[in-house]
Amino acid sequence: GPPNARQMLERLDIDIIWLPNLTKPEELLSSIEMVSERLARAEVAEALIEDVNRGLIQAAANSSNWAEDAPTVLFLLEPPGKSTSGMGGGLNSKADTLIFLAGGKNAATEFSGFKPVSTESLVAMNPDVILVGQSDRHGGSPESIQAMIATPALSEVSAIEKGAVYAVPLDDLAFGPRL
């Protein structure tokens, strides 16, 4: 979370386990181990780690089917609007990891983390698939997604031409045991 929130919690003088901001599945496994150590629940952690590893192996096996012809995928936290940029997940982001685990190639290779994505840059990326994160409080609204799809400047983007624009739960970026 924000640094000021962490500082406030540290002042409470209570035992807190600080976990890193996860961007890769391996980091999830080490976080599970950290928590289990502090809670003295190694047996529970072992079972959970085995379950997560099974899921990762299955995801890798499923995604290997796409290896040569993997679609390019753009994950947007917010789609670009008429006068605003959207927010896209570049390399070394949770979005990048999810795209990889699903068997795709990240279309946003020009930057790392989450950065603004303009209409022009979306045209240049020309992804085969666009995923737009949604939640109750954040992400693209159904209206903003429809507005993006209806934007004339984006009409020749492959994902829009093929109708391959999907709303996905923004919670998918919260790497936890259900990864």
Tell me what each language-model feature is.
Residues 1-38, 115-158:
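Acidic/His-rich segments in extracytoplasmic proteins that coordinate ligands and/or metal ions
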Residues 4-83, 105-110, 160-179:
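Extracytoplasmic substrate-binding proteins
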Residues 33, 50, 78, 93-100, ...:
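Internal, well-ordered alpha-helical scaffold/interface segments
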Residues 67-71, 101, 124-126:
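Short gly/pro-enriched beta-turn/loop segments at secondary-structure junctions
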Residues 82-86, 139-141:
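Short acidic/glycine-rich loop or secondary-structure boundary segments that cap or lie
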Residues 87-114:
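Alpha-helical, coiled-coil/dimerization segments enriched in small aliphatic residues
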Residues 100, 109, 117-120, 125, ...:
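Small-molecule-sensing regulatory modules
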